[in-house]
């Protein structure tokens, strides 16, 4: 089967690799976003998908290079459109490409354009399904393959695969799991499409939810929210959630909402840390206030409902550090308040 692959971030890499190593598929070209400049050094950096495509001839001992195209705006790029039309292609595979494909491109392949989406559609259509799924405290997510149309993840569904979400899973953890699942599901989808063993199912638009692009203000931690809500925000928008500490920004990159109802889900090493904690049943404070510090564990902050253990934080210009190292390095004391410009 002849394929053109559209994709950009690390999430798309496992699917591309599975296509490249499978002799049943011939990847004719890879289309990815243009190289971007890094903040440090202003150096142009290729996408993860481009890196894989450019190294393909080396790790497969192939005599020819895999063509990589990087249109700035594919909707208006007539050269790319004409190139695609010239190919005798069976299917387009699209995984987190980053640009909307117009109908004139979607219509080119014989079997259609297949998208690998990181949610159980029709829930969490849009650009950030993994992040908002975690933010909302979902305990399960998955991958949906679909035939693309011009809408935002509105095409007819082909196959689905689900996976549980652990209480400590962050956006990177879930993305890594889903990227592998997505690659396997895509191969199965293409096989069934080719054999006409799959019936596309229209989405129920009334049941659809949306996962919009994350904005800078979404990263701010509001300590009046519950410990569980803050924990879900921290892991969903990992590693960017931010508060203030002594009038400077402080990222919180890992946390845990204290409460007996959650402890049976925890790995042994975290269980041991929690066993060191004193009785917290009579401890309280104002939202954001550090109400307890335990040696070898770290600081606990009051929230609008419940207590939040700060497992990992990051000060400006520093690397992430454990909650206990943060306490030691800053000489944090009980009674200090996070947030509100403190």
UniProtKB/Swiss-Prot annotation:
The UniProt record lists the keyword Cell inner membrane: no
Its EC number(s): 2.1.2.9
Record's keyword terms, sorted: Protein biosynthesis, Transferase
Signal peptide bounds: none
Gene that this polypeptide is encoded by: fmt
UniProt cross-references to SUPFAM superfamilies, sorted A to Z: FMT C-terminal domain-like, Formyltransferase
Taxonomic source organism: Nostoc sp. (strain PCC 7120 / SAG 25.82 / UTEX 2576)
Binding site for (6S)-5,6,7,8-tetrahydrofolate: 119-122
Protein name listed in UniProt: Methionyl-tRNA formyltransferase
Catalysed reactions, as listed in the record: L-methionyl-tRNA(fMet) + (6R)-10-formyltetrahydrofolate = N-formyl-L-methionyl-tRNA(fMet) + (6S)-5,6,7,8-tetrahydrofolate + H(+)
Highest taxon of the lineage: Bacteria
Family stated for the protein in its record: Belongs to the Fmt family.
Pfam families per UniProt: Formyl_trans_C, Formyl_trans_N
Record InterPro entries: Fmt (IPR005794), Formyl_trans_C (IPR005793), Formyl_trans_C_sf (IPR037022), Formyl_transf_N (IPR002376), Formyl_transf_N_sf (IPR036477), Formyl_transferase-like_C_sf (IPR011034), GART_AS (IPR001555), Met-tRNA-FMT_C (IPR044135)
GO molecular function, one term: methionyl-tRNA formyltransferase activity
Protein's job: Attaches a formyl group to the free amino group of methionyl-tRNA(fMet). The formyl group appears to play a dual role in the initiator identity of N-formylmethionyl-tRNA by promoting its recognition by IF2 and preventing the misappropriation of this tRNA by the elongation apparatus.
Protein's UniProt keywords contain Acyltransferase: no
EC main group: transferase
GO cellular component, one term: cytosol
CDD domains registered for this protein in UniProt: FMT_core_Met-tRNA-FMT_N, Met_tRNA_FMT_C
